[in-house]
Amino acid sequence: CIYVEALMNRTPWRLWNFWKGIPNPKGSALEAMTILENAFEVFPSAWKHAGLLHMYIHLMEMSPHPEKALKHGDILTDLVPDAGHLVHMATHIDVLCGDYHNVLSRNLLAARVDDKFKSYAGAENFYALYRIHNLHFAMYGAMFLGQKGAALEAVSRLRKEVPDEVVHLY
């Protein structure tokens, strides 16, 4: 898992040439994909490894075939139920494949998990950006579903997470 993450970090957020649908020639997307897909094929326990599932989702989300990671996201959503970020991760693929119901429901679930962490650790820490990210995804999914109430609720919660100084600055 750490080796694959290192390969992916050679060209962070540029693993694929999105417009051409090919791997970035300066990166290691194909090598990372081969390693991860081999792990899932050869080692059944890989399907219970949150790190491997997480890396595969990030690897495939800007690839020409994000749908290859749908199963990985479905499994990861329930694997670590007290980690809001991992509950949310499947929606990086769901949104690309048009599954807005899962985008909304999984991010609302992630937001509930995030609330538990916020109660424990407070609001002002590195995880604040993850809470905002999950609520933004929930709002996006709700809008694509035409669920005005859910979208407004998500944006209301989102606004409470973003300090006034940030809102006024941007």
What are these regions (language model features)?
Residues I2-P44, L53-S63, H72-I75, V80-D82, ...:
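Short coil/linker segments at helix-helix boundaries
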Residues A29, H65-P66, Y100, K148:
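TPR-repeat structural position
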Residues K48-A50:
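Active-site-adjacent "gating/activation" loops or surface patches in catalytic cores
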Residues V103-F117:
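Acidic, glycine-rich loop-and-beta core segments that form the ion-binding/anion-interacting portion
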Residues L109, E153-R157:
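Beta-sheet-rich non-transmembrane sensory/scaffold domains
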Residues F137, M143-A151:
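A conserved active-site cap/scaffold subdomain adjacent to cofactor or substrate pockets
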